[in-house]
From Swiss-Prot:
NCBIfam families: nusB. Keywords: RNA-binding, Transcription, Transcription antitermination, Transcription regulation. GO terms for cellular component: cytosol. GO terms for molecular function: RNA binding. Belongs to the NusB family. This is Transcription antitermination protein NusB. InterPro entries: NusB-like_sf, NusB_fam, NusB_RsmB_TIM44. The keyword RNA-binding applies. It comes from Mycolicibacterium vanbaalenii (strain DSM 7251 / JCM 13017 / BCRC 16820 / KCTC 9966 / NRRL B-24157 / PYR-1) (Mycobacterium vanbaalenii). GO terms for biological process: DNA-templated transcription termination; transcription antitermination.
Amino acid sequence: MPDRKGDRGRHQARKRAVDLLFEAEARGITAAEVAEARNALAEKRTDDIATLNPYTVTVAQGVTAHAAHIDDLISAHLQGWTLDRLPAVDRAILRVAVWELLHAEDVPEPVAVDEAVELAKQLSTDDSPGFVNGVLGQVMLVTPQIRAAAAAMQGGHNGGSGT
């Protein structure tokens, strides 16, 4: 029987990462800075503030580190829209999902997309789940090439000759 509690924990971590990205954009800082500040506050106080789930921090740091590439990839697959015109929560959901598609090797692509659609159902407009699914479906088509190119570049930077 699968560990549904672990799945729920990862779902909550993604939702919290979306919250952090949303807050970061509203405050004009990075999600990594919000996560760092939140964990620092939790360490100083002993009341009801808990440290963030490590996966939430990983996602926040990953989206921050790869923000330009993630936004370019999302923008390339928006039809009739610009990233700035999307609801802020949809931007945050798409950023988390695209980071997972590109960088979370332990997350199967369909899981990343399904989780994003679920978050859109919970947090955004009635049209958002279908929109998020459509954009991520297009991103999934190019994900293997992007991962392969990143691996090739990584090999080249590690002194590999490629032959």
